[in-house]
Amino acid sequence: MSTVQVPKLNTKDLLTLEELTQEEIISLIEFAIYLKNNKQEPLLQGKILGLIFDKHSTRTRVSFEAGMVQLGGHGMFLSGKEMQMGRGETVSDTAKVLSQYIDGIMIRTFSHADVEELAKESSIPVINGLTDDHHPCQALADLMTIYEEVNTFKGIKLAYVGDGNNVCHSLLLASAKVGMHMTVATPIGYEPNEEIVKKALAIAKETGAEIEILHNPELAVNEADFIYTDVWMSMGQEGEEEKYTLFQPYQINKELVKHAKQTYRFLHCLPAHREEEVTGEIIDGPQSIVFEQAGNRLHAQKALLVSLFKNVEEPS
């Protein structure tokens, strides 16, 4: 640990990327890259992270559990359905009880308000592993992936095409924070949340970022350095068959990517539905970096865990 300092964060929790400054985000990314190259740093020896899941997960569960093991700690899986919280115990009581037993909480659930209450009532760090509104850990990994590719955010254009969902929301805040140009193209009626867009635009004024919300996918990806998409059907929306027809012009395919820079890179938070939001030709092609991106979930989250846990040990 002689070469890279543990980032000092001015927050107990990570619920959205609003809580981090540009400097903190860059420090986390640099620390994550260090940890990527030094996987077995036992920086959280003996620490326990509770992992509460109300939604299915592959990447979030495995990356947090593996990350805690690599850092010398332990990840404890807690099914939301099996906890007393699933049978009527309040979020507040759950937060206070867990604070007596473990050192931190990661929660992946539906209601963002529940995560906010959990953080408010707990004395230990709480990390949002995904809600219906935000996915900050994914956005941190996305920023890390972009930074590894081009070593800057200034002058870089990220195009997000598809549903204006939780991933889109966190990317908007992330891009605004680091001063990156981000365009979003969605069908009418599927734009990102208006309040989150307003927050991103306000942050962008301070950082020099550009944020554009469009409905034309070709315009959105024009001269883009990175093209990003997500599934058209988020968890809980399966069966909305009419969305498939509406979203078809927003598929990432060889015709659409012709409008991007020739050197563009393709991003996807996964899981992917090939031949729906993206063709196999693109996601499995040479300009796709989706698996490197998925791998960076592990490293970005490790950096976040160490930073938040150390903040509790050494409050400013």
Swiss-Prot record:
List positions binding carbamoyl phosphate.
S57, T58, R59, T60, Q84, R108, H135, P136, C137, Q138, C269, L270, R297
| Top-level EC class | transferase
A Pfam family annotated for this chain is: OTCace_N
EC assignment: the record states 2.1.3.3
Annotated Gene Ontology cellular component terms = cytoplasm
Biological process terms from the Gene Ontology for this record are: arginine biosynthetic process via ornithine; citrulline biosynthetic process; L-arginine biosynthetic process
Q: Which family does it belong to?
A: Belongs to the aspartate/ornithine carbamoyltransferase superfamily. OTCase family.
What name does UniProt use for this protein?
Answer: Ornithine carbamoyltransferase
Q: Which organism was this protein described from?
A: Bacillus cereus (strain ZK / E33L)
Q: What is the lineage of its organism?
A: Bacteria, Bacillati, Bacillota, Bacilli, Bacillales
